[in-house]
């Protein structure tokens, strides 16, 4: 027997996407931050609910700025969570050295525990390194915008003068005036 009642259409909730990145405009240097912003806007236009999580401490530590610029306007469907602390250099250094979000771990965990369908990591070098990947419970993706997972200086350019074809990371980090990563 056929049910005479029409079946209501299924209501499909929008896909909830978290984008986790170190840099995001206006606290960025170009490439990866701009890409993540464009990607967030494209996802929102496609009907997704997007939340961007980034850490302004990294930008402050790398630029020497103590004041964070005001946020840029975002379209409907994009929410930006800017993390910062009273010790931006210390926070960035602890993250870089340990490969985990030492100062901002609780804040990142609380944000990622908000029921996302997808968590998409981008340049996470100074927002939590590989340790941030353990946070949140969703489908997880990582886009490698640079080589920091295999090169502490991000560029595979040994001693800032030649193609890297063998590991000499401690000496190379010193050439780049960066502390070597402990992990």
Predicted regions and their residues:
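Short catalytic/ligand-binding loop motif for oxyanion handling, primarily in non-cytosolic enzymes
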Residues: 26, 59-62, 127-130, 148-158
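Short N-terminal targeting/anchoring amphipathic segment
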Residues: 109-128, 139-145
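Short aromatic-enriched loop/helix-cap "lid" or pocket-rim segments at secondary-structure transitions
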Residues: 31, 62-66, 93-95, 133, ...
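N-terminal subdomain of nucleotide-sugar transferases
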Residues: 2-73, 112-114, 136-139
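A conserved catalytic-core segment of Leloir-type glycosyltransferases
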Residues: 52-114, 118
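Short, flexible active-site-adjacent loop segments at beta-strand->alpha-helix junctions, enriched
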Residues: 23, 56, 84-86, 125, ...
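Charged, low-complexity surface patches
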Residues: 32, 100, 125
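Acceptor-binding helix/loop patch of EC 2.4 sugar-transfer enzymes
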Residues: 87-91, 142-183
């Amino acid at each position: 027997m056929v049910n005479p009642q029409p079946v209501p259409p299924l209501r499909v909730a929008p896909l909830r996407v978290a984008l986790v990145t170190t840099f995001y405009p206006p606290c960025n240097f170009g490439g990866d931050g701009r890409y993540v912003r464009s990607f967030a806007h494209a996802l929102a236009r496609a009907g997704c609910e997007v939340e961007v999580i980034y850490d302004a401490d990294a930008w402050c530590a790398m630029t020497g700025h103590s004041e964070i610029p005001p946020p840029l306007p975002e379209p409907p469907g994009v929410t930006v969570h800017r993390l910062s602390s009273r010790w931006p250099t210390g926070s960035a250094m602890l993250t870089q050295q340990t490969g985990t979000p030492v100062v901002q771990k609780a804040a990142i965990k609380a944000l990622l525990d908000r029921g996302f369908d997808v968590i998409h990591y981008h340049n996470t070098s100074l927002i939590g390194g590989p340790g941030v990947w353990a946070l949140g419970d969703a489908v997880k993706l990582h886009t490698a915008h640079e080589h920091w997972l295999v090169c502490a200086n991000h560029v595979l350019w040994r001693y800032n003068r030649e193609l890297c074809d063998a590991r000499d990371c401690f000496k190379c980090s010193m050439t780049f005036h960066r502390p070597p990563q402990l992990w």
